[in-house]
From Swiss-Prot:
Name of the protein: Transcription activator MSS11
Coarse class of the protein's main subcellular location: cytoplasm
GO cellular component entries: cytoplasm; nucleus
Bias type Polar residues, positions: 173-218, 564-581, 599-640, 666-677, 704-720
InterPro entries per the UniProt record, alphabetical: LisH
UniProt organism field: Vanderwaltozyma polyspora (strain ATCC 22028 / DSM 70294 / BCRC 21397 / CBS 2163 / NBRC 10782 / NRRL Y-8283 / UCD 57-17) (Kluyveromyces polysporus)
Keyword field contains Cytoplasm: yes
Subcellular location: Cytoplasm; Nucleus
PROSITE patterns: LISH
Disulphide-bridged cysteine pairs: none
């Protein structure tokens, strides 16, 4: 023991015995030999598993990986083996290609059975440096923890840089924070007691301690744990802080009082004392109690005071300090609180308050300016408001219009155009409808005779009354107007609708548009209604007696009826053309016709419908009149040598004076006034009567005729003054008859012109040009005869003036 003490003493003194030196040298040699063996030894690695810091999930595993790597690099193999057994090292499945192992890492687990006692695991480190990550790790943590361990608690507490802004809610176990917290509470109580009674001053903001509050910390000893030696200093500092706070309060109050003296008046409190309030409420008081001009003046004064605020407030504060020192000599002003110029420095808290007041005053000025601008701005009228609203609505309306136009364009583009097959089908439908109309008109014409026979007397009486009323200048009644028109058996409304739909279908077909199915269905329904009405009319007429001879003779725009050989009555249609001479001639002609007529089969002339204009006047011309069917089935057949001779036979017949055939049908006409010498034949333009059976016609000396033989054996007589056109056959085409009709139409034009020239008192509607008549003739030529469009049923296509009459619902 004594030797050991000696060696220790020698070690402290730096001196060692010879034995000790020899023993130490022997130990070093043995350790060097071990190190050489370890350095020369080559460990065996198991490359199936590797240690990698990339697979570390915690900081502890990361540290273990670098410790193991450090042991391998320094050849501490035995320590590394033991470390693998005890530490949780992050492992990675090994691979021959190290890059692949790093890119696609997979975690692995190590068991003691898998690892040979003489084997080690290789390392694959991502964070590897010359000094190794382990050294940097320990240097970082040592620098952190050494600072904490070496420094005292008081020094750490003094480094609280935010101590003036952060206040603890509950006192801590340390004595220093509790003293500071209690002192701050006492300061707040004193500030509340020294206030002038305004509760709003307590909400000006949290109290900020002066820099002098930190004196007790700097005066304390950093080596001592408790500040016992600074009790007296703290009391002195508290007194100084209280005096400073009082001075700052008085300074703020004086600055506000100076503003009150410059003209700003605030309302008083309950005790009658005036007190200062926050400038935010000043704006409301000023705006409520003063006019705009007074407010502007007050704001100008405030602006001047604020521009001189720094120097003015410093001077006022210095004066306040002097007054306090004179009033209370026991509390002199120390030199530390006054700068070299003799002015008291403004605290940061008061300066912030002053700046906030300035900002509020500027906001108040801006509000006043905005109010003045609004008052000076002229208010818009109602018209201007409406115009602005309309302008605002214009873009919306334009957008809606554009949307509608776009929709229409899209719908037009998407609308399917009719194909050629559809157009062909439409044309076939039109042809079928025309054929059905022709067949219906023929069937109705064959059965219309008995009905016209019964209605003849009543119609003739009504027409006579209407014509008498027109001649006397009296207005016609609605019943008389209806009697003048030939209503027929078919409803005119259905015909009008049918024809209007036909026109629409034709326009659609011309424009290559598709015909809707609804229109086609309506057409078929109207066709069925027409057929039903015609069948009902036929059923009503069956069983009634039918006469063998039915004549309709329109003589110079007059209707003559001779039922059973009785006396005839002639009534004129127009005032200008009805003269006494014409009446006398008509009576003589009618008497001669009655004498020459067949006794066994008396002729009955059925009245025709007289076209009237929209104002109720009767149209004088015979254009557009509708003739009923003339039935001459029982008349004897004519015998003539000129049958089939054509034009040559016609010329020869004109030279003959007396016909050899007996007279079965007599028709006569009287020439118009002023044209008795050279009279021209008059025909109904565009209207021909269909003949059933055969007929013979003959004329007296005053009415020379031209008899023409038809292909079917019937005869046609062309009268110079009047051409009834009985030779038209509805079942077959006849070229000769067509030529004769064209010639008669030309003659009719001339006759109408002569009538217009000879009758100066005629109406303007009676004056018709040749072009208009030719146009009407062209429009009336449908099929073989006028009956193909149902003209015999009271269905007029065109009126005198060339415009549609009954089609469009005149």
């Amino acid at each position: 023991m004594k030797r050991n003490r000696d060696t220790k003493m020698d070690h402290k003194s730096g001196k060692m015995n010879a034995n000790d030196r020899n023993q130490q040298n022997n130990i070093k040699q043995e350790f060097k030999s071990d190190l050489n063996e370890a350095a020369n030894a080559q460990p065996k690695y198991n490359f199936n598993i590797m240690v990698s810091d990339a697979m570390a999930k915690t900081s502890k595993q990361l540290l273990y990986a670098h410790i193991y790597n450090y042991l391998l690099h320094n050849k501490h193999l035995e320590t590394a083996k033991q470390f693998l057994k005890e530490a949780d090292v992050p492992l990675l499945t090994g691979n021959n290609n190290d890059d692949v192992a790093v890119k696609n890492p997979t975690a692995a687990t190590l068991s003691q059975n898998d690892l040979n006692p003489r084997e080690l695991l290789p390392t694959k480190m991502l964070m590897n440096a010359n000094d190794t990550f382990l050294l940097e790790w320990w240097e970082y943590f040592s620098s952190v923890y050494d600072f904490v361990d070496t420094s005292d608690l008081s020094a750490l507490q003094n480094n609280d840089f935010l101590q003036d802004r952060i206040f603890p809610i509950l006192p801590t176990s340390n004595k220093v924070p509790t003293q500071r917290y209690s002192r701050q509470q006492s300061d707040q109580v004193q500030m509340n007691q020294n206030s002038t009674g305004n509760s709003s001053r307590s909400g000006m903001g949290t109290p900020i301690a002066n820099p002098s509050n930190q004196n007790y910390q700097h005066s304390s000893n950093p080596n001592s744990g408790t500040p016992t030696s600074t009790a007296n200093n703290n009391t002195n500092n508290n007194n100084n802080n209280n005096s400073n706070n009082n001075n700052s309060k008085q300074f703020a109050q004086q600055t506000l009082n100076s503003q009150l003296q410059n003209g700003v008046v605030y309302p008083s409190n309950q005790n009658g004392q005036q007190h200062a309030r926050r400038p935010q409420s000043v704006s409301s008081d000023i705006s409520n109690t003063m006019s705009m001009d007074e407010q502007q003046q007050q704001m100008n004064l405030l602006k001047q005071v604020n521009s001189q605020n720094p120097q003015l407030m410093n001077n006022m504060l210095f004066q306040n300090v002097q007054q306090q020192s004179s009033s209370s000599p026991n509390t002199p002003v120390s030199a530390n609180n006054v700068d070299g110029n003799g002015q008291f420095p403004i605290s940061k808290m008061n300066w912030n308050r002053i700046q906030r007041e300035r900002m509020r005053i500027m906001r108040q000025q801006q509000q006043i300016r905005q109010q003045q601008m609004q008052q000076q701005r002229p208010q818009p009228n109602q018209q201007q408001i409406q115009q602005q609203q309309q302008r605002s609505q214009l873009p919306q309306q334009q957008a809606q219009q554009r949307i509608q136009q776009a929709k229409q364009q899209v719908s037009q583009q998407q609308r399917p155009h009719p194909t050629q097959q559809q157009v062909h089908q439409m044309q076939q439908m039109q042809k079928q409808l025309q054929q059905q109309l022709q067949q219906q008109s023929v069937m109705q014409g064959q059965q219309q005779g008995p009905m016209q026979l019964q209605q003849g007397q009543t119609q003739s009486q009504g027409q006579g009354q209407a014509q008498d009323a027109q001649q006397q200048g009296q207005p016609l009644s609605q019943q008389q107007m209806k009697q003048l028109r030939n209503g027929g058996n078919v409803d005119s409304n259905i015909q009008q609708q049918y024809m209007s739909m036909m026109m629409q279908m034709m326009m659609l077909s011309k424009n290559n548009q598709q015909i809707p199915q609804q229109m086609q269905q309506q057409m078929m329904q109207q066709m069925q209604q027409l057929q039903q009405q015609q069948q009902q009319a036929l059923q009503q007429n069956t069983g009634k007696p039918q006469l063998s001879h039915q004549f309709v003779v329109p003589v110079n725009n007059q209707v003559v009826t001779t039922p059973g050989g009785s006396s005839t009555s002639a009534r004129t249609k127009s005032n200008a053309r009805s003269t006494n001479t014409n009446k006398k001639k008509m009576e003589t002609v009618s008497k001669k016709n009655n004498k020459r007529s067949d006794i066994n089969s008396p002729a009955t002339i059925v009245p025709i419908s007289t076209p009237t204009s929209s104002d109720g006047n009767i149209i004088s011309s015979t254009q557009g009149t509708n003739f009923p069917i003339v039935n001459l089935s029982q008349a004897p057949t004519p015998t003539s040598k000129a049958e089939g001779d054509g034009e040559a036979g016609q010329n020869k017949k004109r030279r003959r004076k007396k016909p050899k055939t007996p007279n079965t049908n007599v028709s006569a006409s009287t020439p118009t006034a002023g044209n008795t010498a050279n009279s021209t034949p008059v025909t109904t333009s565009g209207v021909n009567s269909s003949v059933v059976g055969s007929a013979t016609t003959s004329n007296d000396k005053r009415t020379p005729s031209n008899t023409v033989a038809n292909n079917d054996g019937s005869m046609q007589t062309n009268v110079n003054e009047l051409d009834i056109g009985l030779g038209m056959n509805t079942n077959s085409n006849n070229n000769n008859n067509n030529n004769n009709n064209n010639n008669n139409n030309n003659n009719n034009n001339n006759n109408n012109n002569n009538n217009n020239n000879n009758n100066p008192n005629s109406n303007s509607r009676d004056k018709i040009n040749n072009n208009d008549l030719n146009m009407n003739l062209d429009m009336m030529s449908f099929g073989n005869s006028a009956s193909s469009m149902g003209l015999n049923d009271g269905f007029q296509l065109f009126d005198m003036d060339g415009f549609p009459n009954d089609i469009m619902g005149s």
